[in-house]
């Protein structure tokens, strides 16, 4: 009874996560008692739980920062906004997956369980305040992502992607845990983040070699989750081999959660070593922007191209992490991350829809698509232009604000490189856009010739199209309504 009262006292702060846990239990029960394999009730339960969690989180928005469950979780505006981002990702990815699951005739229950579990792990990771909870939440997110990548068991490419993802993910987690063990030992046996800092000061180990080594290990572990160069090797293969809706999910969810973790870990644990980890992050960001954009130019697979594009995009976002000491550093990172979620998911919704109708992922096979499906063409064009940063779309204003904050923070070497590589990215985005409106060798490809779409092509009829339109609108309107978004982001603190 005492434990139950304690849960009621502290549980309010993690009520959104509790709703997701309840939905997981209900989903399993419905699957056990239902004779129908893919009952619509499963979608209803999952989407209702996610919407309820979003509403609860919005009601908790202005509450005072609090540490709950013996300082295991820390709830504040910074953590809440990243928890909200993860819920938005899941809320968009489930409708995006409905038609895919129906067409491929794969099991729905497992898919929803993995999505909800990964969402739960990501949300806990955003507010975890000790090393053990961080690792458990990270593995909850990671293991669910591994299982999702191998969701289509009979697909050889999916199995290969899962194996690569699992092996490299396990290696990065091992490195991260070793970094945690060094912090635990150097601080005199502390696991809570702020107590680790106090312990390091007490043991006079704060500027020791062991502390620097632990920082390197943490950077490697987090770099894998963020797909930063040179820890990106898994990304193209996993993106290409995994089911497209699954790629859409962990291309944003894992990055949101890992970004929240990296920002909190480095700013809380290494405040006096900021020069060192800022320099290391700058090197990784520059490598990611240059390598990601140059290799993306050579790709012929749409998913591999988006994989390298995502590597370069996270390089841009790192500018906001490094510039966090300025007044607008966090705000620029948060603003661009929100815009990136919609741009990226909108693009993946487009290629999911095209893949279901044609069965191909080759960029050349998109030639002449505008003659058959103007809605899909327009949506893909707007999302790609927004990713490239073309005004007046939201991607332009997000990048402009991000680069301006970086310049204001004194990143005079990093920002010009970001601007230059952003121009390079426009080449492969515009190359695809040109292809959509032209015919290959003056004739349509066999895939476009056999492309079937109803006469009411401009009216959305499927859940993928509805998700696609929501993402396209959200990738466009914030360019006009950017000031309120920035104002909300500027009120976000640890």
Curated annotation (Swiss-Prot):
EC number(s) given by UniProt: 7.1.1.-
Membrane-topology annotation of the record: Multi-pass membrane protein
Location, primary (coarse class): plastid
Protein's recorded name: NAD(P)H-quinone oxidoreductase subunit 2 A, chloroplastic
PANTHER family in UniProt: NADH DEHYDROGENASE
GO biological process: one example: ATP synthesis coupled electron transport
Organism (species): Angiopteris evecta
Enzyme class label: translocase
Location relative to the cell: Plastid, Chloroplast thylakoid membrane
Subunit description: NDH is composed of at least 16 different subunits, 5 of which are encoded in the nucleus.
Keywords: Chloroplast, Membrane, NAD, NADP, Plastid, Plastoquinone, Quinone, Thylakoid, Translocase, Transmembrane, Transmembrane helix, Transport
Known catalytic reactions: a plastoquinone + NADH + (n+1) H(+)(in) = a plastoquinol + NAD(+) + n H(+)(out); a plastoquinone + NADPH + (n+1) H(+)(in) = a plastoquinol + NADP(+) + n H(+)(out)
Transmembrane parts of this sequence: 13-33, 39-59, 81-101, 107-127, 131-151, 166-186, 211-231, 243-263, 277-297, 305-325, 336-356, 378-398, 411-433, 468-488
InterPro entries: NADH-Q_OxRdtase_suN/2, ND/Mrp_TM, Ndh2_N
Family, similarity comment: Belongs to the complex I subunit 2 family.
GO molecular function annotations of the record: NADH dehydrogenase (ubiquinone) activity; quinone binding
GO CC aspect terms: chloroplast thylakoid membrane
Role of this protein: NDH shuttles electrons from NAD(P)H:plastoquinone, via FMN and iron-sulfur (Fe-S) centers, to quinones in the photosynthetic chain and possibly in a chloroplast respiratory chain. The immediate electron acceptor for the enzyme in this species is believed to be plastoquinone. Couples the redox reaction to proton translocation, and thus conserves the redox energy in a proton gradient.
């Amino acid at each position: 009874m005492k434990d139950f009262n304690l849960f009621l006292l502290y549980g309010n702060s993690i009520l959104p996560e509790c709703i997701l846990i309840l939905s997981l239990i209900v989903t399993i029960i419905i699957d056990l008692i239902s004779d129908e394999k893919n009952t619509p009730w499963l979608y209803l339960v999952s989407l209702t739980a996610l919407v309820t969690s979003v509403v609860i989180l919005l009601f908790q928005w202005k509450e005072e920062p609090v540490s709950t469950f013996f300082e295991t979780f820390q709830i504040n505006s910074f953590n809440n906004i990243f928890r909200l981002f993860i819920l938005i990702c899941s809320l968009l990815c489930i409708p995006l997956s409905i038609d895919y699951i129906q067409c491929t005739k794969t099991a729905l229950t497992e898919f929803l369980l993995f999505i909800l579990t990964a969402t739960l792990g990501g949300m806990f990771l955003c507010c975890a305040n000790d090393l053990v909870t961080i690792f458990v939440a990270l593995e909850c997110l990671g293991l669910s992502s591994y299982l999702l990548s191998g969701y289509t068991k009979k697909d050889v490419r999916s199995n290969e992607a899962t194996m690569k993802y699992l092996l490299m993910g396990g290696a990065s987690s091992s490195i991260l845990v070793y970094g945690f063990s060094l912090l635990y030992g150097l601080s005199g046996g502390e696991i809570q983040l702020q107590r680790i800092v106090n312990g390091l000061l007490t043991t006079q180990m704060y500027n020791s070699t062991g502390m620097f080594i632990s920082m390197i290990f943490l950077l490697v572990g987090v770099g894998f989750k963020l797909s930063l160069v040179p820890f990106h090797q898994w990304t193209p293969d996993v993106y290409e081999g995994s089911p497209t809706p699954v790629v859409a999910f962990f291309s944003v969810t894992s990055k949101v959660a890992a970004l929240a973790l990296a920002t909190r870990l480095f700013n809380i644990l290494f405040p006096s070593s900021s020069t060192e980890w800022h320099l290391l992050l700058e090197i990784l960001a520059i490598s990611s922007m240059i390598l990601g954009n140059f290799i993306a130019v050579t790709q012929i697979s749409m998913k591999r191209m988006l994989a390298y594009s995502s590597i370069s995009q996270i390089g841009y976002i790192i500018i906001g992490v490094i510039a966090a000491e300025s007044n607008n550093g966090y705000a620029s990172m948060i603003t661009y991350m929100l815009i990136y979620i919609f741009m990226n998911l909108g693009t993946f919704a487009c290629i999911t829809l095209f893949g279901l109708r044609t069965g191909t992922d080759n960029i050349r096979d998109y030639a002449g698509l505008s003659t058959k499906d103007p809605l899909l063409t327009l949506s893909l064009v707007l999302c790609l232009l927004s990713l490239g940063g073309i005004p007046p779309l939201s991607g332009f204003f997000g990048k402009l604000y991000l680069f301006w904050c970086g310049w204001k923070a004194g990143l005079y070497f990093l920002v010009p490189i970001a601007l230059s590589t952003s121009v390079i990215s426009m080449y492969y985005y515009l190359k695809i856009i040109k292809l959509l409106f032209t015919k290959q060798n003056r004739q349509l490809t066999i895939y476009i010739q056999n492309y079937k779409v109803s006469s009411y092509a401009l009216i959305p009829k499927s859940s993928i199209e509805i998700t696609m339109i929501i993402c396209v609108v959200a990738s466009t309107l914030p360019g006009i309504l950017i000031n309120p978004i920035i104002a909300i982001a500027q009120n976000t603190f640890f």
